[in-house]
């Protein structure tokens, strides 16, 4: 009995002394959490949603933690030109069209005549604040003055591009200036503020009898401006965004050409690097045609614009490299060399032109604009017209030049 009591007493004392030590140990040693596994970034990681302020803009991709070679970086970068304080007339945007009336003001009682007068419009690259003032003088085929008109500055200033629109005035008496003959007419455009001649040239107006007109009335005709001379002339252009600029090649075609049947392939130093059939774009630009042409496709001129967005671009800022959508993009302004554009219609080659990129990160100046005194903000390209797609007269087109001004360096 006494022995049992001693054993029990010893057990109680052991428990009493051990409890404070155990309590102190639990307070001093915190519970260590298990580490959570982190996902490994992959190339399929999706960018964050675009914000409302910049819809459709790609978002920066996560920086790669790979120990491989670092991505390319640095310039040269494409720089968007600033609009000049002195207006720059852009001759490639000059459009001369005919406005016609189903009567002739000199024979008021004859309703079977068709008369016409010119209307023009053009763009000016300009960043100044003063209102633009221009006038146009028109000359008859014999060189005598036909009439003059003040041109309207429409206030259509595009803040993004620095482009302003100037065009013929809205004149209810324009029909009193109309004529009933075709031929080669002269035009002179003057900047009224300094009395400088910004452009002088000629345009050919063709008078023809439409097939849909009444054969009994020989003077029920139509008129159009002959634009065959545009076919051997192309332009290398750039469309600027914040981080990149898309190169655009502009060309003219004659006939009712379907854009879906066109394909433009881009070659660099002899190797194809892009095609509009794979992520590229073929867009219709300006269109000129005879109003009463009916089904005559030969009286239709259409500008097409070829580009390869996301495939080839001009890099403007280093930020562009952070966007997943551009990780495989070729930056042309960092790839000096020679480029060739070949255009196909239903698989048959119909156009070819070439341009170069200089070491300064922009189109190399081929000198055509400068030596022909054409103050465009684009690069003029000689275009080789191939095949039988276009029903045009190459000899007459070369003779006509650029609105009557011979252009050196072109290949008709």
Model-derived segments and spans:
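Aromatic sugar-binding surface patches on proteins
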Residues: 116, 155-174, 294-327
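Short beta-strand elements
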Residues: 194-223, 348-387, 403-408
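A glycine-anchored, Pro-Gly-centered beta-turn/N-cap motif
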Residues: 179-188, 335-338, 342-347
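N-terminal export/membrane-targeting signals
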Residues: 1-24
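N-terminal propeptides/low-complexity segments immediately following signal peptides
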Residues: 24-70
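Conserved aromatic beta-strand anchor motif in extracellular beta-sandwich/beta-rich domains
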Residues: 136-140, 189, 264-268, 343
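Contiguous beta-strand segments within globular domains
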Residues: 91-133, 222-268, 376-412
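Solvent-exposed serine/threonine-rich low-complexity stretches and specific carbohydrate-binding patches
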Residues: 142-163, 274-309, 355
């Amino acid at each position: 009995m006494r022995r049992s009591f001693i054993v029990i007493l010893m057990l109680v004392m052991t428990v009493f002394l051990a409890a404070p030590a155990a309590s102190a140990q639990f307070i001093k040693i915190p519970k260590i959490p298990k580490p959570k596994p982190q996902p490994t970034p992959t190339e399929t990681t999706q960018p964050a949603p675009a914000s409302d302020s910049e819809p459709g803009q790609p978002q920066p991709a996560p920086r790669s933690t790979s120990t491989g070679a670092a991505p390319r970086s640095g310039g040269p970068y494409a720089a968007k030109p600033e609009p000049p304080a002195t207006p720059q007339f852009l001759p490639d945007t000059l459009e001369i069209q005919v406005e016609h009336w189903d009567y002739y003001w000199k024979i008021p009682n004859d309703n079977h005549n068709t008369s016409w007068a010119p209307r023009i419009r053009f763009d000016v690259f300009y960043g100044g604040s003063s209102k633009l003032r221009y006038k146009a003088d028109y000359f008859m085929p014999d060189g005598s003055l036909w009439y003059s008109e003040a041109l309207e500055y429409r206030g259509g200033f595009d803040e993004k591009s620095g482009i302003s629109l100037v065009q013929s005035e809205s004149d209810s008496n324009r029909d009193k200036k109309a004529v009933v003959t075709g031929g080669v007419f002269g035009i002179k455009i003057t900047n009224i503020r300094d009395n400088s001649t910004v452009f002088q040239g000629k345009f050919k107006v063709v008078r023809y009898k439409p097939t849909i007109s009444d054969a009994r009335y020989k003077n029920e005709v139509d008129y159009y401006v002959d634009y065959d001379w545009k076919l051997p002339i192309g332009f290398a252009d750039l469309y600027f965004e914040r981080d990149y600029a898309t190169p655009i090649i502009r060309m003219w075609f004659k006939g009712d050409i379907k854009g879906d049947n066109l394909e433009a392939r881009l070659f660099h130093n002899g190797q194809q690097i892009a095609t509009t059939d794979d992520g590229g774009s073929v867009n219709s630009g300006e269109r000129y045609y005879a109003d009463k042409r009916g089904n005559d496709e030969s009286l239709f001129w259409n500008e097409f614009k070829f580009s390869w967005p996301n495939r080839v671009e001009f890099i403007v800022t280093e930020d562009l490299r952070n966007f997943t959508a551009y990780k495989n993009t070729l930056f042309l302004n960092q790839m000096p060399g020679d480029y060739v554009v070949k255009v196909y219609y239903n698989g048959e080659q119909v156009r070819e032109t070439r341009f170069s990129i200089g070491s300064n990160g922009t189109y190399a100046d081929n000198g055509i604009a400068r030596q022909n005194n054409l103050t465009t903000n684009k690069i003029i390209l000689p275009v080789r017209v191939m095949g039988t797609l276009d029903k045009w007269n190459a000899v007459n087109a070369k003779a006509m030049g650029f609105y009557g001004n011979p252009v050196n360096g072109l290949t008709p």
